Every structure is written in C-alpha cells, then in structure tokens.
C-alpha cells in the first residue's frame, strides 16, 4: 500500500478555513441590520385601585411651634 502524503494538508485546511471566514465576513457585511431598535410604546391604561376611590386625609408633618 502506498503511503498517504499528508504534507500539504495543513496548508489546504488553513486556506479553506481562511476562505470560509472571508466569505462569511463579506456575506455578513452585505446584510443590513436596524441601527437602533426602539421598543414599541404601549399606551398605559390607568386602572383604578380601590383605595383611590376613597377620600383619605393627608396629614402634614408636625411643624415647630411659632413664637
């Protein structure tokens, strides 16, 4: 059986990997992506809470006695 010559395998594999890398870079470069994706603004629906329906007394903080 003849011996398989593997001396050129390293350069072949290296060149294939480099070529694939360049091809994918060019493919990605041509594709366009949105610059700044903005989240959609959803309108906020105001839901009334049970404690909002009732009148509540708001107390002011204690003030110092005036002389």
Swiss-Prot record:
Subcellular location: Mitochondrion membrane
Keyword Zinc-finger on entry: no
Molecular functions per Gene Ontology: proton transmembrane transporter activity
Membrane topology, from the record: Single-pass membrane protein
N6-acetyllysine carried by residues: 54, 57
Membrane-crossing residue ranges in chain numbering: 8-24
GO cellular component entries: mitochondrial membrane; proton-transporting ATP synthase complex
Top-rank taxon: Eukaryota
BP-aspect Gene Ontology terms: proton motive force-driven ATP synthesis
Pfam families named in the record: ATP-synt_8 (PF00895)
UniProt entry keywords in alphabetical sequence: Acetylation, ATP synthesis, CF(0), Hydrogen ion transport, Ion transport, Membrane, Mitochondrion, Transmembrane, Transmembrane helix, Transport
Residue(s) carrying N6-succinyllysine: 54
Subunit organization: Component of the ATP synthase complex composed at least of ATP5F1A/subunit alpha, ATP5F1B/subunit beta, ATP5MC1/subunit c (homooctomer), MT-ATP6/subunit a, MT-ATP8/subunit 8, ATP5ME/subunit e, ATP5MF/subunit f, ATP5MG/subunit g, ATP5MK/subunit k, ATP5MJ/subunit j, ATP5F1C/subunit gamma, ATP5F1D/subunit delta, ATP5F1E/subunit epsilon, ATP5PF/subunit F6, ATP5PB/subunit b, ATP5PD/subunit d, ATP5PO/subunit OSCP.
Function comment: Subunit 8, of the mitochondrial membrane ATP synthase complex (F(1)F(0) ATP synthase or Complex V) that produces ATP from ADP in the presence of a proton gradient across the membrane which is generated by electron transport complexes of the respiratory chain. ATP synthase complex consist of a soluble F(1) head domain - the catalytic core - and a membrane F(1) domain - the membrane proton channel. These two domains are linked by a central stalk rotating inside the F(1) region and a stationary peripheral stalk.
Similarity remark: Belongs to the ATPase protein 8 family.
Protein name listed in UniProt: ATP synthase F(0) complex subunit 8
Upper classification of the organism: Eukaryota, Metazoa, Chordata, Craniata, Vertebrata
Gene: MT-ATP8
């Amino acid at each position: 059986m003849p011996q398989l010559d593997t001396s050129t395998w390293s350069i072949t594999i290296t060149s294939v990997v480099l070529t694939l890398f360049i091809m994918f870079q060019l493919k990605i470069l041509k594709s366009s992506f949105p610059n700044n994706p903005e989240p959609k603004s959803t309108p906020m629906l105001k839901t009334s809470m049970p404690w909002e329906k009732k009148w509540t007394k708001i107390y002011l903080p204690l003030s110092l006695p005036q002389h």
